A protein has these predicted regions:
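Proline-threonine-serine-rich low-complexity tracts
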Residues: 1-178
Length: 178
């Protein structure tokens, strides 16, 4: 037997899991490969994927028959990350300064947000406060990963005015009637 197997592949989509990895098997890629005798093995040029593979990847399915005849064909594996970041926030207290203003950063509000791939940005719905915000304020931390998945969570920001007023007095001369 000198006849090569006929290799037939199919394209697949792989969604990464919570750890940022995904995999496929040769039988998933094989779409009905045949041989005039018997197929002995099916192997893939790549079967494991991670965050660095997001997008399209060309792989090869290699089929070998029982007599050592080999052929291969390509398949396109589309790797996608559809898992939103896990957003974890913490409440903060902001003391206004002498000008009546105060601010916070997304990093201060973030309390350990994670993503199966990588976090690209953290933004706050409100980061600057003034005297009109004294008391409790609910804000949102929005986290976006490198693949465009977004989620957000709220945090309570307590704004306080702890600067004592400055009292300015003037001297007065009082005349008394005798």
């Amino acid at each position: 037997d000198v006849i090569k197997p006929t290799v037939i592949t199919q394209n697949l989509t792989v969604s990464l899991d919570a750890s940022g990895s995904g995999s496929i098997t040769a039988t998933q890629v094989d779409n009905g490969s045949t041989d005039n005798c018997t197929i002995a093995t099916r192997t893939l040029s790549k079967s494991s994927f991670d965050c660095s593979d997001v997008g399209t990847n060309t792989i090869w399915l290699r089929v070998t028959d029982v007599n050592g005849n080999v052929d291969s064909a390509s398949a396109v594996i589309t790797v996608q990350d559809v898992i939103k970041p896990t957003v974890v926030t913490q409440n903060l207290t902001v003391s206004l300064d002498a000008t009546g203003s105060g601010s916070i950063t997304a990093t201060q509000v973030d309390n350990g947000s994670t993503d199966n791939c990588t976090i690209a940005t953290r933004t706050l719905s409100k980061s600057s406060f003034d005297c009109s915000n004294v008391g409790t304020n609910t804000i949102w931390l929005r986290v976006t990963d490198v693949n465009g998945n977004v989620d957000s969570a709220s945090a309570v920001i307590t704004v306080q005015d702890v600067i004592k007023p400055t009292v300015v007095t003037q001297n007065l001369t009082v005349s008394l009637d005798a």
